[in-house]
Amino acid sequence: MVLRFEDTDKERSKKEFEDDILAGLAWTGLPYTTPAVPRQSERTYIYRKHIPKLIADGHAYEAEPGKDNPDKKVIRFKNPNKNVTFADSVRGEVTFDTTELGDFVIARNIDEPLYHLAVVIDDHEMGVTHVIRGE
């Protein structure tokens, strides 16, 4: 199991939440493979490298400034606007219409990547094949 702290949202990321997660894992005896738990906030240099390539390849674009940061343009993922089908280990074959999503923000600006970008890059780099999340 890979453990990392997804702390790109500074307001909702607190040390006590991390402590609770570590205590819960220790209590259950679930092992995790990362000796030093990586934090997304410490890996922004990695995510920043991918933004220009996504833009150059036509998968993302700079959009009008967001209300939270009116001086810098946000970076949006360019939605493919089609049906996407994939195999889910729990639900079986899942299909959804990406036209319902719109082009979502993946970075507050060229220097501030958000969770939606960071988590995909981390999953790929860390060899994650299965993800379990609460619903």
Predicted regions and their residues:
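A glycine-rich helix N-cap at a beta->alpha junction
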Residues: F17-S41, H50-K53, A60-A63
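Active-site cores that bind ATP or allylic diphosphates and position pyrophosphate for catalysis
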Residues: L3, R39-Q40, K53-E135
